[in-house]
């Protein structure tokens, strides 16, 4: 590869990274605004806002942006924040089920963009309920390994608070619980002196589909296209990626 083409490739990749960083910031800000609108600006009584702010800070969103988002969402700046949460259902390659969660101020725009991204990237839209039945809402909390020596240490801290299970995912321990137990589990971690990276309510698949490398690449292409949409907040799929396939995907990212 010539020096010029290598620089052009590097510059292109940086532009993509910068664009996705900006989109990530915008989505985090939107979460803060909605949390503040629903529960108010006082974080002592709004755990959803606490989580939204914490996630934004860990992603390096500037504090001024966070403060403005809290005030704007709570109506303290005279602006009206009016977002709707809409869920779209579809299938990626090889029948992998997909839920696309949008937070939008324009339902028609969101629907059109999701449909277009689906059709252009190998996906198909599904009827309401035909995919969602396979997903359950769960509280999902990620604890980095350097915060707790073992899985048993994490489980001991959160079991009485309502945690259902703890799974070791290599770099993090993942705690699952009912959404209504999220606050109690977070507090139990804090009381045990254990910090966490993220705490979110997610749609967790009950049944997963193991995928090969070709299918995984196709699914990732569709997920990337969806993540580029401004109205899309979260994407959930039921693909199960074996370790060797994940290693190959990681190699793809480094090229």
Curated annotation (Swiss-Prot):
Keywords: Cytoplasm, DNA-binding, Transcription, Transcription regulation. The keyword Cytoplasm applies. The keyword Transferase does not apply. Its main location: cytoplasm. One of its GO terms (molecular function) is DNA binding. It comes from the Bacteria. It holds the Pfam family TACO1_YebC_N. It is found in: Cytoplasm. One of its GO terms (cellular component) is cytosol. GO terms for biological process: regulation of DNA-templated transcription. Belongs to the TACO1 family. This is Probable transcriptional regulatory protein CMM_1817. It comes from Clavibacter michiganensis subsp. michiganensis (strain NCPPB 382).
């Amino acid at each position: 590869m010539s020096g010029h083409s290598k620089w052009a490739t590097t510059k292109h990749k940086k532009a993509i990274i910068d664009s996705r960083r900006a989109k990530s910031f915008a989505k985090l800000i939107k979460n803060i605004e909605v949390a503040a609108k629903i529960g108010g600006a006082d974080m002592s009584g709004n755990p959803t806002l606490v989580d939204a702010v914490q996630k934004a800070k860990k992603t390096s969103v500037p504090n001024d942006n966070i403060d403005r988002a809290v005030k704007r969402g709570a109506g303290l700046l005279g602006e009206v924040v009016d977002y709707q949460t809409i869920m779209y259902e579809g299938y990626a390659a090889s029948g992998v089920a997909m839920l696309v969660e949008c937070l939008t101020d324009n339902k028609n725009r969101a629907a059109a963009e999701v449909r277009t991204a689906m059709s252009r990237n190998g996906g198909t839209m599904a009827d309401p309920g035909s995919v969602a039945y396979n997903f359950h809402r769960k509280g999902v909390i990620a604890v980095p390994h350097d915060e707790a020596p073992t899985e048993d240490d994490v489980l001991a801290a959160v079991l009485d608070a309502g945690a259902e299970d703890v799974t070791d995912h290599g770099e993090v321990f993942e705690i699952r619980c009912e959404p209504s137990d999220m606050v109690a589990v977070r507090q139990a971690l804090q009381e045990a002196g254990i910090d966490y990276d993220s705490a979110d309510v997610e749609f967790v698949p009950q049944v997963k589909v193991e995928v090969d490398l070709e299918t995984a690449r196709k699914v990732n292409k569709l997920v990337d296209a969806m993540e580029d949409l401004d109205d899309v907040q979260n994407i959930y799929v039921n693909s199960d990626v074996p370790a060797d396939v994940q290693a190959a995907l990681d190699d793809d990212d480094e090229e």
